[in-house]
């Protein structure tokens, strides 16, 4: 076998991958995609994005000037600013269409990256390490039928394989993350029975 890893290496790496997968699931793919997009906006060499940001700042300044003067008292200046604002708005809309295509490709790239980091390693491990004994239980710790279930699908009684380890680790990680995140969730008000 070309991937001859120690069983404890497999245990720890699968645990870390499952932990990352649960954290990604808790945060949400859309939140991660939005973070990647904002990061891309900051570091991108794309000229359309730079123009978009510059024009947004210009539009903000023009609108600020428009609000500071009276349309009745300084009509010519207000009209000139209004034309500039309309022109900038149309340019911003054109740039926004270009940027939307970039956002779609960045979102797709983020999805692929998340899949490569969380889902693909699990499937690779299931294929290559499905017959690897990860650890052994001493005989008599559990009743015989529980040892048999823990040895599923390919192992002699008393051995624990990847399938059972992944199931157990995923359950524990999910429960711990749920307990930790519960403390930060919005409080739910006690329901009050309505009188008839």
UniProtKB/Swiss-Prot annotation:
Cellular compartment(s): Endoplasmic reticulum membrane; Golgi apparatus membrane
Gene3D superfamilies linked: Helix hairpin bin (1.10.287.660)
One annotated GO biological process: tail-anchored membrane protein insertion into ER membrane
Alphabetical GO CC annotations of the entry are: endoplasmic reticulum membrane; GET complex; Golgi membrane
> Which segments of the protein form a coiled coil according to its record?
76-114
Lumenal topology ranges: 1-10, 136-159
In this entry, the parts of the chain located on the Cytoplasmic side of the membrane are 31-114, 177-196
Similarity comment: family membership? Belongs to the WRB/GET1 family.
Its annotated function is as follows:
Required for the post-translational delivery of tail-anchored (TA) proteins to the endoplasmic reticulum. Together with GET2, acts as a membrane receptor for soluble GET3, which recognizes and selectively binds the transmembrane domain of TA proteins in the cytosol. The GET complex cooperates with the HDEL receptor ERD2 to mediate the ATP-dependent retrieval of resident ER proteins that contain a C-terminal H-D-E-L retention signal from the Golgi to the ER.
Name the UniProt record assigns to this protein: Golgi to ER traffic protein 1
Q: Which organism is it from?
A: Candida tropicalis (strain ATCC MYA-3404 / T1) (Yeast)
In the record, what lineage is assigned to the organism producing the protein? Answer: Eukaryota, Fungi, Dikarya, Ascomycota, Saccharomycotina
